[in-house]
């Protein structure tokens, strides 16, 4: 009975499931029934809008990416199925239905022990933690190790939500919100490491250009819509399209630049009253401690700098795929949401697209290399879910290329010791620096409050 109920809820998808969770959560916080319904509906509408814009990108840029690969005769055999392909496979895994209550219990335990301020209401994105557990289960054959993977991943991302809370608030202007999920959060530590290194390099540390700088310098020709149009022209030309195809693609990428920030607005309209109510109720009950509502990283995609970086990294990621030694993955399914990978980097670099380019190249290189290493397990996951054609192989950049997932696999089932040492050293250094950076911000805020 429990499994049937959970399966039905999961099949509703995030555009229905998240509003339901939000309505229930809002009611628990003491909001009026009408306000709860309105907030949940606005959030659902916003995510439908995001889905439509992402669908537009996937339908237009996806074929262009494949055409680019064929045009340049790229020898990449395994197609990235992206999160739209990976998430259903994950929910069909043996540990999926148990992973949801486990991840929720981890969150509750961390809140009660004051180890996190993040109150996660984004149940759908627990699939990221579940993916880690599912691959660990396949790699080791141990159900308990798979569950341990869910627990470790969950605890880690809730802390990431805490550590990047200042960036979420100050750069993205999301008051009372945390973004603990997906590539945006777990790629953030790499950006922190890159930013610290750049700060130490004389001359390079002074280079700065942002979406706002481009707009100021070029006027109407530097506006986001125009930048989107130009990026569409470049992608279309690289894909070998004719004039008609190039222009059609350019208008669609321009539309993405205009529409993405606008479809975020209904979500913010729904979240604002909930965040205020949550802060006041939870702080009153738990002695003034500030709490954050954990939500989907899609909220970050509406920022102009993130959209600009996304369009830059669509063709750039295909180039990176060619250059990464041993890579077998052709970027495809996740290209439309490439902004997830660099969104937190944009905030860490304070909108500096030069630094975002550097950290983004490193992030995507690591992602593709890890995605290649997990092809075997990912293919097995797809086969178990009945989502694999005979003789086929699958990969994904989102989660399939996750450092936390791959490092845990190597801990419990070592296969590539040199890679484990190198990736582990880079990632753990980034995590340490992220923790230290967050502590520094807290100390600064305490000094300001004291003054």
From Swiss-Prot:
Membrane topology per the entry is: Multi-pass membrane protein
Report the induction information. Answer: Constitutively expressed.
Query: In what way is this protein post-translationally modified?
Result: 84% of isolated protein was N-formylated.
GO:BP terms for this protein?
Answer: galactitol metabolic process; galactitol transmembrane transport; phosphoenolpyruvate-dependent sugar phosphotransferase system
- N-formylmethionine-modified residues are 1
Task: Please list every transmembrane segment annotated in the UniProt record, as residue ranges.
Answer: 9-29, 41-61, 92-112, 138-158, 218-238, 305-325, 329-349, 357-377, 392-412, 415-435
The UniProt subunit note reads as follows: Forms a complex with one each of subunit of GatA, GatB and 2 subunits of GatC.
Name of this chain's protein: PTS system galactitol-specific EIIC component
Q: Which organism is it from?
A: Escherichia coli (strain K12)
Q: What is the lineage of its organism?
A: Bacteria, Pseudomonadati, Pseudomonadota, Gammaproteobacteria, Enterobacterales
Protein encoded by which gene: gatC
